[in-house]
A protein has these predicted regions:
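Sec-dependent signal peptide recognition
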Residues: 3-12
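Metal-dependent phosphoester/phosphodiester hydrolase catalytic core
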Residues: 23-344
């Protein structure tokens, strides 16, 4: 065997090993709060990540509609369809909704056009005709992804369709702990217990509103403390490790409760007080509320590091060989701001 042939063979073998190493990493980007009326330069950065999947965590359009024709929602979807880059449509997409693509700010089961909004939502995402969400009430779903020898159980919750009405006060939402108060509704809870029992190495739970934080005045699971405890107990009673992804807040952060980690990523293009009219509204608010809205030093007992108020996205890199998940929150340029490494 001549030397030239040997060198070529070694080179091809090296390339093969390199490709095998790359193939063992599965990348999932995620984010929330995507305003169709604003520029979306962040997609260019995310394209460079060469992700396998993207998870939309709610407020994927801003189309609040209080009339039965849902004209504002239809227009919002029409505009957003033009904004979503073509390369993204070739990836595996997972999506849940929050209040602004549900149809009403901070809305729940009292929204009388929720059935119509659900069909518009599914049409926008080109959900297949046999998608269970086409025939069920609510947009919750369960999907299994196999990555080499790893099995991911992606569970998307609907925190709007069945949710009991809330009571808003000047200092935030009043906690409601009556027995009939619900976040998910009876049918979705039954389904969730079943979804959690699926054999998997890692659960990725999608909730549009935050699960772990308790100390801020905005929407969160803690508004229904019994429901939050119920969810944490359900997650604590299974052996599979869980990562919660959430949005809504127009800020990003990392939270930890025992073996459960929650990553909040928000917003993709709508940072807090980014426009002149939002700044005007903030200036008209009481100082105490304004400070809580824009102060990145908000603290919570489960919070790790300071919150991020600039435009951001999340990136989850799953290493099936070393059985680890690296979760990063990145800015619009792709620079990591915070990271969290979790063993599977």
């Amino acid at each position: 065997m001549n030397k030239l042939y040997t060198y070529r063979l070694f080179f091809l073998f090296f390339i093969f090993l390199s490709n095998q190493s790359i193939a063992n990493d599965y990348k999932i980007a995620f984010g929330s709060c995507l305003d169709q009326e604003l520029p979306q330069p962040i997609w260019k950065t995310i394209e460079g990540e060469d992700v396998d999947s993207f998870i939309f965590l709610g407020d994927n359009v801003y189309g609040d509609s209080m009339d039965g024709k849902l004209n504002k929602m239809k227009l919002a979807y029409k505009k957003q369809k033009k904004m979503i880059p073509s390369w993204l449509k070739e990836k595996d997409l997972f999506y849940i909704w929050d209040d602004h693509d549900y149809g009403v700010n901070d809305g729940g089961s009292e929204y009388k056009y929720r059935k119509e909004a659900q069909q518009l939502y599914l049409d926008f995402w080109n959900s297949k005709k046999d998608d269970k969400r086409r025939s069920q009430e609510g947009t919750y779903f369960n999907s299994i992804i196999n990555i080499d020898d790893l099995k991911l159980n992606i569970i998307g919750l609907d925190t709007r369709y069945f949710r009991s009405s809330t009571k808003n006060r000047q200092d935030g939402y009043e906690p409601l702990d009556k027995e009939n108060i619900t976040m998910l509704g009876k049918d979705q809870w039954t389904w969730l217990y079943d979804a959690l029992s699926n054999e998997a190495d890692l659960i990725i739970l999608l909730s549009s509103v935050q699960v772990l934080p308790t100390n801020h005045q905005f929407e969160k699971w803690e508004i229904f403390p019994n429901e939050r405890v119920k969810l944490l107990n359900a997650l604590g009673n299974i052996k599979t490790k869980t990562i919660i992804l959430s949005g809504d807040r127009h800020r990003a952060g990392v939270y930890e409760y025992g073996d459960i980690v929650e990553i909040t990523s928000s917003s993709l293009n709508k940072a807090i007080a980014d426009s002149w009219y939002e700044k005007l509204i903030l200036n008209l608010m009481p100082k105490s509320i304004r400070k809580k809205l824009i102060d990145p030093k908000e603290q919570d007992e489960f919070q790790i590091n300071e919150l991020i108020s600039e435009v951001n996205y999340g990136l989850m890199t799953i290493d099936s060989i070393n059985r680890t998940v690296l979760i990063e929150i990145k800015d619009i340029s792709g620079k990591p701001i915070q990271s969290y490494l979790k063993e599977i």
